[in-house]
Amino acid sequence: MRHIAVVYKRMRPEAARLAQDIKSWLAKRNVLVFCMENIDSAGVLSSHQRVDFPQDTDLVIVLGGDGTLLSVARLIESRKIPVIGVNLGGMGFLTGITIDNCYMELERILGGDYEIEERMRLRVLVRREHREIFSHRVLNDAVINKGALARIIDLVTVIDGRFLTHYRGDGLIFSTPTGSTAYNLAAGGPIVFPTAQAIIITPICSFTLTNRPIIFPSHVIIRIELGEPIKDVTLTCDGQVGCLLAPSDRIVITAAANPLRLIKTPTVDHFEILRNKLKWGQA
């Protein structure tokens, strides 16, 4: 790898210092480094376009938490640039490298001692009166939920053209396996191995107590409509972008064509991450 981009939040001094240290470290190894610092305090890269990454970028190093990496995943879109995250945030399910082992892991990567995991993403479309008004790829999840003062919402759910059910409650989470340890887990959904190919539907505070999360194969087409006209229903993608839904909108969710290419070194163990982050086996 000879061309590497480093992305970090400029609002965090420790991230800026680490970015410059990594840049100097890589330069000594004859690597050209491109630093992207224009990220707001929420980790959102809304001001950037895909062309901001040079065409010959071999790797993107993300300094921050999972939210920053989610923004980078959206920024990359369909480009096949591999990504590695250095955790400066909280849980860090996606950013598996720590500051302590950062340079050891980068040395492994430069030496070719790594594998690339393909993490499936979802494509989320909103159609209104035969027009496509919203389209995004998500790495973690898409969430349909009601506003703070709205009543229970009714979401008519159709899978591959066949009616599934009316979900009545506070909303629905549509999660990838990568996102299964995020909002999906907090809402009582299952943990799915991150490289699996599946779409998880998890109800949020379902009015019907027998409604439970369902795991679907990744090839299904999911269509959602509002069963009753109601205001203040929102679609949110990866917790960062979204739109207000109109009563006649149709939401279509499928597996995206281009997965995110996430670098994994031999020292990263998904089961160890689960044990540490979720404190399994600890008194």
UniProtKB/Swiss-Prot annotation:
Cofactor(s) required for function per UniProt: a divalent metal cation
EC nos: 2.7.1.23
Gene3D superfamilies: Probable inorganic polyphosphate/atp-NAD kinase, domain 1, Probable inorganic polyphosphate/atp-NAD kinase, domain 2
Catalysis: reaction(s): NAD(+) + ATP = ADP + NADP(+) + H(+)
UniProt binding sites for NAD(+): 66-67, 140-141, 151, 168, 170, 240
Subcellular location: Cytoplasm
GO-annotated biological processes: NAD metabolic process; NADP biosynthetic process
Alphabetical keyword list: ATP-binding, Cytoplasm, Kinase, NAD, NADP, Nucleotide-binding, Transferase
Gene Ontology CC: cytoplasm
Active site: 66
GO molecular function, one term: NAD binding
EC class: transferase
Pfam family, one: NAD_kinase
Disulfide bonds: none
Task performed by this protein: Involved in the regulation of the intracellular balance of NAD and NADP, and is a key enzyme in the biosynthesis of NADP. Catalyzes specifically the phosphorylation on 2'-hydroxyl of the adenosine moiety of NAD to yield NADP.
Sequence similarity: Belongs to the NAD kinase family.
Name used for this protein in its record: NAD kinase
Primary gene name: nadK
